[in-house]
């Protein structure tokens, strides 16, 4: 069993966040000894899932719904699976957006390395948009690709 302070350190979360999660009912079976929360393995696993879902962009109200489904047993497996499929898609979309952002940053790093080497941007601008070095062209193309939602 762990105290709220220990769990706070383990997960790098403020104690106030853990208290908030408890207040919201995300640890329904947490033990209390003399009104002090004691976190067991069940709460730690719940916290891992809660943090995963939060990092994926899910709101607390939806996490609460997931936790409610968990407490309702195996009849809610389809809803839980659907929730994770939806979050998986959201994360994959965000990863694609970040990959494009990273390619723009990679291109600009190369761009300014060349500008520093050449003393100006003239040579680079002559190569744009389609005469860049072989290893840079796909990065440039991806970073400058127009995405229609």
Regions found by a protein language model. Give the residues of each.
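Basic helix-turn-helix/winged-helix DNA-binding cores
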Residues: 1-68
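C-terminal regulatory/oligomerization modules of transcriptional regulators
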Residues: 75-149
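Short linear sequence elements within intrinsically disordered, low-complexity coil regions
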Residues: 7, 25-26, 44, 71, ...
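A short, mixed-charge helix-start or loop-turn motif at secondary-structure junctions
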Residues: 32, 73-74
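Residue-level recognition of short, well-ordered coil/turn positions
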Residues: 26, 58, 74-75, 120
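Long, amphipathic alpha-helical segments that form or neighbor coiled-coils/leucine zippers used
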Residues: 65-68, 72, 84
């Amino acid at each position: 069993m762990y105290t709220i302070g220990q769990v706070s350190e383990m997960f790098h979360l403020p104690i106030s966040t853990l208290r908030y999660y408890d207040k919201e009912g995300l640890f329904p079976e947490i033990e209390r000894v003399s009104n002090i929360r004691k976190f067991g393995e069940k709460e730690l696993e719940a916290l891992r899932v809660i943090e995963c879902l939060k990092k994926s962009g899910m709101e607390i109200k939806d996490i609460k719904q997931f936790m409610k489904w968990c407490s309702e047993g195996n009849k809610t497996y389809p809803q839980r699976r659907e929730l994770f499929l939806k979050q998986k898609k959201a994360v994959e979309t965000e990863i694609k957006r970040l990959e494009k952002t990273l390619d723009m940053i990679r291109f600009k790093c190369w761009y300014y390395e060349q500008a520093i080497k050449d003393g100006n941007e003239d040579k680079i601008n002559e190569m744009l948009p389609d005469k860049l070095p072989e290893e840079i062209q796909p990065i440039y193309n991806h970073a400058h690709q127009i995405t229609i939602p």
